[in-house]
């Protein structure tokens, strides 16, 4: 797996957006509560703060994210474009596309990922992760650029399941959550342990108001991601996000220690509901 800067691989960076919905350890019946809207959202990325140790001097890019409710589950499509400028003057561009699906019970997750950058050929891998009772055991299987099978713990959660769970926790007034998450990444980075802190609900007062997408309030949520099984006290990365009760994220910041990346919603629209009758 190539590196975009020392100590951090591409999928760890990309997963930091898509799996900012990832850290609870609550039963899958959480699926029956929070209502997440089908929507497409576009985000603009920019460099946040950096310290004297940061080799990356500037970041620019765009993210397009589509979450669509289907009769048997949820489809999720992500497109990323990043441009990194290093202190050496070197500029690197990265493109990534991910197409995934999660069943409505939160027990099956499939993914198809394509990545390329300015100095390596395209990498393509597909696979799935499955949990009981859909299967006798919890596991993830890969093909393509990676040919591997992982044994998972049964308390792993997938993205949409987690999104609903964390919103439910916020509505219940819970302040902290932790658990294991399966992230749509390479086998070595597939599972993360995350600790989330949920802040007090705040009014949404941005100039960007999108009918049906943005709501009148949000919760500030701070999630720290750790490599599974590690005893390290410092996370690999940390995310601060503004999460609305319909599952929409309007603003987030990824903190890698030496620097931060800021993303803000630029436009979005609702997707018409599927008739499952």
Per-region residue spans from a language model:
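Bacterial N-terminal signal peptides
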Residues: 11-25
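N-terminal cleavable signal peptides for secretion/export
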Residues: 28-91
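N-terminal secretory signal peptides that target proteins for export/translocation
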Residues: 1-10
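A short, structured loop/turn motif at beta-sheet edges
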Residues: 32-38, 66-75, 101-107, 212-213, ...
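Hydrophobic/aromatic-rich structural module bridging two neighboring secondary-structure elements via a short loop
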Residues: 78-132
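Mature, soluble, non-transmembrane domains
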Residues: 112-277
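Residue-level recognition of well-ordered beta-strand positions that form the cores
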Residues: 44-46, 64-66, 79-81, 97-101, ...
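Short, surface-exposed coil-to-beta transition loops
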Residues: 58-63, 93-97, 121-125, 234-238
């Amino acid at each position: 797996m190539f590196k975009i800067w020392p100590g951090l691989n591409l999928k760890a960076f990309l997963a930091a957006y898509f799996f900012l919905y990832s850290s609870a350890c609550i039963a899958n019946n959480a699926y029956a509560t929070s209502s997440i809207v089908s929507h497409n959202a576009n985000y603009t990325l920019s460099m946040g703060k950096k310290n004297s140790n940061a080799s990356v001097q500037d970041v620019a890019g765009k993210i397009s994210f589509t979450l669509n409710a289907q009769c048997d589950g949820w489809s999720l499509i992500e497109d990323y474009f990043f441009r990194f400028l290093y202190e050496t003057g070197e500029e690197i561009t990265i493109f990534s596309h991910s197409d995934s699906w999660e069943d409505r019970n939160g027990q099956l997750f499939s993914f198809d990922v394509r990545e390329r950058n300015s100095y390596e050929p395209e990498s393509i891998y597909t696979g799935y992760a499955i949990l009981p009772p859909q299967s006798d055991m919890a596991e993830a299987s890969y093909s393509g650029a990676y040919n591997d099978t992982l044994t998972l713990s049964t308390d792993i959660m997938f993205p949409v399941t987690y999104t609903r769970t964390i919103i439910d926790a916020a509505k219940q007034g819970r302040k902290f959550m932790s658990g294991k998450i399966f992230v749509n990444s390479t086998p070595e980075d597939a599972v993360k342990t995350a600790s989330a802190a949920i802040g007090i609900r705040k009014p949404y007062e941005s100039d960007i108001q999108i009918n049906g997408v943005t709501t009148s309030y949000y919760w500030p949520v701070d999630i720290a991601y750790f490599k599974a099984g590690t005893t390290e006290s410092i996370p690999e990365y940390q995310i601060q996000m503004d999460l609305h009760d319909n599952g929409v994220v309007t603003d987030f910041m990824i903190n890698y220690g030496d620097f931060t990346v800021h993303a803000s919603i630029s436009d979005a629209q609702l997707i018409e509901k599927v008739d499952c009758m």
